[in-house]
Amino acid sequence: MAGATDTQGEAPKFWVVQDANGGWHPDHGDAGDFARRYMLLKFPVPESGPRATDILRNEAAYQKVAQTLGLRVTPSLPEFIDGALLIPRFDRRHIDGREVRLGVESIYSVAGVLDAAATTLRHQEVLIALAACVTDFHEEMKEYIRRDLLNIALGNRDNHGRNTAILKDTDGTLRLAPLYDFGPAFLDARAISRVIRWEGEEPGTTNWNVVLENLATRLEEAEIAIADWDAIPTTMRSFGARLKDLPALMRDCGVDASIIEQRRSDIERLASQLAAIASK
């Protein structure tokens, strides 16, 4: 395949489109009305080391796990084919014979971060920024928190602000875009670490009651009212209860057995921590 794209990130990628006859073409940005599917073709990152292909292949399985747990994913999930991941795009649609393009803005942009390398961003700050732009902040906050809990459980440490975005849908609704770049980043030979953390987060020993207290304080300081605050800790406890069956779910979704065993202790620890969240 010739050409390149302006797709960000370190993984080699190509935008591609599929026509009505099933043929694939590079997407030069002017596919017009002949395109029926809009996809991203993603290849392993050589610098990720000997498990680069494992990371990419299990990204497809991780998406199945997220879908089963009720997180927002694309209607059709990524497919690992011939050493590459074919990912449905959520910013393009074919509707009534026309190509429709949707607006997308990264979390860094929403939060006003100009220099990510020189900025320490916390999840509380991200949520404050989201409150100013999404249509239903309460629902998006629950979605955002559950995504990060699953990041922790499954070892997706690559959580920088370009790996989460806001999507403007055709009806004008603004909400978190479907989950993307979600995989076992803990396997990466580059020793990727979590970039965005919670105020009060302590790796391995986090007291989520403290995290929630910090979040409530920050939202109050920002004059963001939450009508049903109790739903937040309830959501987290409920999600934690589901994590107890996560290893079995991972197996059913096709995650490698070795990855399941590597994540098992962290999953159990997080489930125990979330069960300790106080209820009022």
Show where each model-derived region lies.
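Anionic ligand-binding catalytic core segments
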Residues: M1-G161, A165-K280
